[in-house]
Every structure is written in structure tokens, then in C-alpha cells.
Amino acid sequence: VEVQVQRSTMEIPYGYVWDQAQASGLDEINPAELAKWFPSPQLSDIGDEIADGELYEPFDDRPLALFDALRTDFSLKRLQHYTGTPVAHFQRYLLFTNYHRYVDAFIDWGLEQLQSGGRYKELSVAGGVVVNAKTKDARELIENAPWRRFQMPAYHLIAENGAGITLVNIGVGPSNAKTITDHLAVLRPECWIMVGHCGGLRHSQTIGDYVLAHAYLRDDHVLDSVLPPDIPVPPIAEVQVALQEAAADVTGDAGEALKKRLRTGTVVTTDDRNWELRFTDSAKRFNQSRAI
């Protein structure tokens, strides 16, 4: 394979090049005036046609990546804006949550890992706080960090070569999940998992059961334009097996005992946070889909 490197026809927008210190004093300048002299983002040049599978006809010049440079820079800036942490601190294994108690648990576990002298080196927190095994009063520093300024604060347990874990508190709703994953996708992470809870729909379920989806009834509509609801989202066998084995490790159960704790079936996602108020309509749809 012969690879040629040439000067790009796309200029790098000034907002993607300047950091906060370099941009000091520019707040008083009209953005339109800056755009006269410096390249600015052209949204018509930014898109997800490759990743969304819209470029399906044969073409001579094949893309080298799912996301081009402009799309990547666009998302890197958004990640920094939403999460309050440097993009370089993001790790390849991602967790999402919308409960602060999971954030607290992750921080406590992360600090324990730092003290154990293992492969994790630092814990980076939204608001510019970074601690390591030698940091005094690390928990207090983290609690006092200005993480509340950011819509989706991130917490990075950093290991070499990005092999650590990142937790992002994405807030409530499927639109938030789409927002952050649209941007995280340019980092090409190994995997991401949502850590939260769902409402059980069957009397055989009890609080604390694990639920592993093998199908989805997608009533959230956030992906309908690029992945219509009639196109199924197939479960990935390797992920399903890994999660099942993890549940067995955590509970210590196996066989029939594990089946009582780990339920598999159809999971409903919805953009109506108050679907219970229209339960008559919802119940019929849930029953038809065999949702759990």
C-alpha cells in the first residue's frame, strides 16, 4: 500500500488551535471580525456520512478513518467544553452514569488503586484537579474541585497508553447519551458501558437484579434519522459473555442461582420520562415486545 501525505485543502479553524491562554483578550473582538482574518469552522464540511454508512457507492478515494480532521477537532473541543477535563486524559475504557453516588464510588475506588501502587498513575477530575498516590488530602481536593461548572463532568483513572478508565456523569436522558457519544466516538475507545438502573416490568423481578439486554425497543428516537427503528441493533456476543461472567464474579452465583439474579430480554428505551402517566398505551407495547 502506497501512502501519500499532502497539504490539506481544509484549513484548521483558529478555535481549534488556540488554547485558553493564547485566546486571552479575544473576548472583546467580534467573532465576525476574527473570521475575516482567521479560518473558522465551516459546518458544511463537518459530518458523519462515513461513520453513518451513507457513502455506500464505490469510489476511487477511500477514507482512511471514520472521522476526518475537521470532525475530530470539532468533537475534541466539545469534549473539553462538556466534561471540564483535557482531552488527553480520556482513557480507552469508558463508563457513563447519571447518579452522583456512582461518581463517589468511582473516586473512592480510584484513590484506592493509586495507593496500591498498581498500573494506575493519576486521577484527573473535572475542574482541573489531578491527584496521584503522593497527593495529600486528595479526597478533599476532589470534592472542592469546580466540577459543577460543567454539564457532563468527567473523571479519569489514568494508566499508561490510555489503558485506564474514564467515568462521565452524562445526566438524564437519551439525548445526553447521544451528545457525548457522538464526540467520544472520534477517540475510537475500546468500549463504553452505561452504569445505572432500569425499571423492571415483570413481577418475577426484584430490586437489585442484573439486566442484560439482548434486544432493544427503541422509543427514544434519538437515532431514528441514521438508524431507523425497524433496523435491529444486534447484541455483541463477546460483550454479552463478558458482562455475564462479570455478574457471576461479583455475585459468586452460577447456573440457576445466577439466572435468578441476571435477567436477559428486551429492554425499552424512551424519551418520555413520564411514560407511567400513559400506562395503558405503554403496557400494550411492552407486552407485545416481551420487554423486561
Give the label of every model feature segment.
Residues 1-191, 199-292:
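Accessory terminal and edge-of-domain segments that mediate assembly/interaction
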